Amino acid sequence: MKRKSCRTGRNEAAIDPLVVSGLTELATGALTGWLYTLVKTDREKARSLGIKSGARVRQWHLDLIALGGLTAMAGTAVPDLPNWVRWPLGIGAWTNAMSFLPLALDPDIEKRLPFRVAVVASFVSTSVGFTGLALTAARRRG
């Protein structure tokens, strides 16, 4: 792994961008917990912000945490992933989780074709990424 010099003068290993993406998604999920808390404690305030489905806020919050953590783990457990795995995994993890936010604001959006197409594309991306991760790990096993 490449080394970078940090401000203190020590050398530290460069962090894989996929790991950074996963950790950022995980942190975003942690922060969305505040919004979910608002949904649970002050429904009127949440509604005034445009939230129509608290259940979808919960799904958004949990998916960001789960997929962010799994993405960070993936980039750590199997370093130097090929681009055909790295990009679909990183993009799919974000788009899968983020697809719940529009549903929180407009539950009927799931009936619209553009939304459905986007969700299918996201599932394809995530499926390619996680399957590619498993295949890459199996090939490197030994």
Where are the regions a protein language model picked out?
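Hydrophobic alpha-helical transmembrane segments of polytopic
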Residues: 22-26, 85-96, 122-125
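Interfacial loop at the N-terminal end of multi-pass membrane proteins
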Residues: 34-60
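N-terminal signal-anchor transmembrane alpha helix
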Residues: 14-40
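Helix-coil boundary and interhelical linker segments in multi-pass alpha-helical membrane proteins
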Residues: 4-20, 74-87, 133-142
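Non-cytosolic membrane-interface motifs at loop->transmembrane helix junctions
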Residues: 88, 111-121
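Hydrophobic cores of alpha-helical transmembrane segments in multi-pass inner/ER membrane proteins
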Residues: 66-73, 125-133
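Transmembrane alpha-helical segments of integral membrane proteins
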Residues: 96-110
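Core segments of alpha-helical transmembrane spans in multipass integral membrane proteins
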Residues: 27-28, 32, 54-77, 91-98
